[in-house]
């Protein structure tokens, strides 16, 4: 199965409602879609999200990295030489993790097709069903409460609440949400780097003292501030998860060695794809640190790849793969099957994606 070409397209899907965090507001999913064409007629699908404020990657840079560096490095190679292809992918250009992720995902799709097995089984096969949380965007406490109630009515058992703009207002948001939904639903909070270490400690301890029952807090401080992250971890009882602080396996090893956090959020757009995400999973097993598999605001192609990885590995105990359910429609034929919070993988080779209607 020889790689003959890499073709780039686009997937644009409006959201059901605007997606708001501490750093941005978005109205649609806009992915760069990759198809790897082979001499056998097999096609591998991958995609990448433009997330300039997180990864530094935008649509133009993703396309440029693929067309000008990645394509010329791996076209002509055989999928059976998989490790060699991944080494070329890693080394052909510095950074550009989203572009690398898109191609990596398509390569793994072909790898599964080559050996006639769904990807999650090749990667470990721990389970074939998952349950995701759903994100509640930053808005007024009243609107966030309404959105939370709506999500619970749809069967979601875990909500991820976006905070990080104003600690006092964030605490009010949590109070109003708990009042609206009760205590049977899990709440996670994601500050998206929005707090300073000391204010994070104050806010989280106040949340705990009020009995608001928070499962975890994600990236409370700036990504670069590992000492601040550790300070928060050491001074609160609510488990702290690193997100933007961990892109690479090297980043993961550093925060694990420091015990700067309690958990890690793995995202394929940060790691450069599945191959580096697997290395983080291996490190997490060694250090005994559970992981979440998360996504950016992505469509179903790349999220399906994340679902396969999450299903394969025991160390991935928390799932934040809600991108497809935030979209107003599904333009991807095949792939992971969503029923609100419930995700099921089909036993088709690779990712099980047949095409894209967009």
Swiss-Prot record:
Pathway: Cell wall degradation; peptidoglycan degradation. CDD domains: L-Ala-DL-Glu_epimerase. It comes from Clostridium acetobutylicum (strain ATCC 824 / DSM 792 / JCM 1419 / IAM 19013 / LMG 5710 / NBRC 13948 / NRRL B-527 / VKM B-1787 / 2291 / W). This is L-Ala-D/L-Glu epimerase. It catalyses: L-alanyl-L-glutamate = L-alanyl-D-glutamate. PROSITE patterns: MR_MLE_1. Its EC number is 5.1.1.20. Mg(2+) binds at residues 190, 218, 243. Belongs to the mandelate racemase/muconate lactonizing enzyme family. GO terms for biological process: amino acid catabolic process; cell wall macromolecule catabolic process; cell wall organization. It is an enzyme of class 5 (isomerase). Pfam families: MR_MLE_C (PF13378), MR_MLE_N (PF02746). One of its GO terms (molecular function) is metal ion binding.
């Amino acid at each position: 199965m020889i790689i003959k070409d890499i073709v780039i397209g686009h997937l644009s899907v409006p959201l059901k409602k605007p997606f708001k965090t501490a750093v941005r507001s978005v109205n649609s999913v806009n992915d760069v879609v990759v198809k790897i064409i082979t001499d056998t007629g097999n096609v591998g699908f991958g995609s990448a999200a433009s997330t300039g404020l997180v990864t530094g990657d935008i649509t133009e840079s993703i396309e440029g990295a693929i067309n000008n560096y990645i394509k010329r490095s791996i076209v002509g190679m055989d999928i059976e030489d998989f490790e060699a292809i991944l080494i070329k992918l890693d080394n052909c250009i510095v950074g550009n993790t989203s572009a690398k992720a898109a191609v990596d995902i398509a390569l793994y799709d072909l790898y599964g097709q080559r050996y006639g097995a769904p990807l999650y089984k090749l990667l470990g096969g721990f389970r074939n069903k998952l349950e995701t949380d759903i994100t509640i965007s930053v808005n007024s406490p009243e609107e966030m409460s309404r959105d939370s109630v709506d999500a619970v009515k749809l069967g979601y058992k875990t909500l991820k609440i976006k905070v990080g703009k104003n600690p006092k207002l964030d605490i009010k948001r949590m109070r109003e949400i708990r009042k609206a939904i009760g205590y049977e639903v899990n709440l996670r909070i994601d500050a998206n780097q929005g707090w300073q270490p000391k204010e994070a400690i104050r806010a989280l301890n106040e949340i705990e003292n009020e009995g608001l029952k928070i499962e975890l807090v994600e990236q409370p401080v700036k990504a670069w501030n590992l000492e601040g992250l550790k300070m928060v971890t050491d001074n609160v009882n609510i488990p702290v998860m690193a997100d933007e602080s961990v892109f690479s396996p090297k980043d993961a090893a550093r925060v694990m060695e420091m015990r700067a956090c309690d958990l890690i959020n793995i995202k394929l757009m940060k790691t450069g794809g599945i191959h580096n995400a697997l290395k983080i999973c291996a490190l997490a097993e060694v250090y005994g640190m559970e992981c979440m598999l998360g996504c950016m605001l992505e469509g179903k192609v790349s999220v399906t790849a994340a679902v396969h990885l999450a299903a394969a590995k025991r160390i991935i105990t928390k799932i934040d793969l809600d991108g497809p359910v935030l979209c107003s429609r599904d333009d991807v034929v095949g792939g992971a099957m969503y029923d609100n919070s419930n995700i099921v993988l089909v036993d088709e080779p690779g990712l099980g994606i047949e095409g894209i209607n967009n």
